[in-house]
Amino acid sequence: MASITSNSQILINNDSSTNKAPTTNERQLRRINHPPNLRIVPPLNFCPVENQLYRSGQPSIINQSFLNQLNLKTIIWLSSEEPTDEFLEYCNDSSINIEYLGMINEFNSEPATATTTDKQSQSQSQSQSEEQKSQSQSQSQENQHHQFEQSDNNLLQDPSHLISSTIAKINNNNPWDSLNENTIKHALDLIVDKTNYPILICCGMGRHRTGTVIGCLRRLQHWNLNSVSEEYRRFTGSRGGRILVELLIESFNIDLVNINWELAPDWLK
């Protein structure tokens, strides 16, 4: 009888050992082998700036799940390229207002609110003029880029002309150059109004144009200029920052920004 009891106890012990809870390593392996169906991909160079204020490169379709988590109300679009139809449709379905500031210049000082209807009407009205100007624009863009890089080197050798050269370059209407003062003012007017929040500020790569607006915002927050430059260069990659961008940030007149302190975000007060 004793041997039968001991054998039954062995069988019971074996059964209990096979039904024990999985170890930590087993749980980790199970998570790796079975990833969730929902994949969240942030836009390039995404980073929080302040509470409910974000910056990034130009969002695409694969970033929609991530953007849904932000509950955005406004997107400040600084890129010279217009948003795609798919992205406009997503923003329309999500009730996100796109402020298209990428092409503001001295002749067109008003921002555009991008919608699918607006984009279709613009493409129809501009199709003929774009065909006529496409050849001349493609030739001039290369020359402008070369002059832009050459001017940066000249500024290093002759610091006495820094500010004057900066203003002359900023006022150029070439969309490949840095933003002008008008664009920055419009962007900051939107940022200092908490009724527009949450806000995403974006441009093509989330580097120079976005960095210019953020740098001027930091000046509005009375940051030290060294800290402003360090934050700007953090997003520029291996090529480093542009001298003209940093000079524009330094010379921007923050008194141009219209601040209603009753509607200003708490972090600005």
From Swiss-Prot:
Compartments in which it is found: Cytoplasm
BP-aspect Gene Ontology terms: cellular response to oxidative stress
PROSITE patterns given in the database record: TYR_PHOSPHATASE_DUAL
Gene Ontology, cellular component aspect: cytoplasm
Comp. bias regions, Low complexity: 120-142
Catalytic residues (UniProt): 203 (phosphocysteine intermediate)
SUPFAM superfamilies xrefs: (Phosphotyrosine protein) phosphatases II
Top-tier EC class: hydrolase
EC number of the protein: 3.1.3.48
Superkingdom of the source species: Eukaryota
Ranges where the Tyrosine-protein phosphatase domain occurs: 45-261
Any GO molecular function: phosphatase activity
Similarity comment: Belongs to the protein-tyrosine phosphatase family.
Function per UniProt: Putative tyrosine-protein phosphatase required for protection against superoxide stress.
Protein name: Putative tyrosine-protein phosphatase OCA1
Organism expressing this protein natively: Candida albicans (strain SC5314 / ATCC MYA-2876)
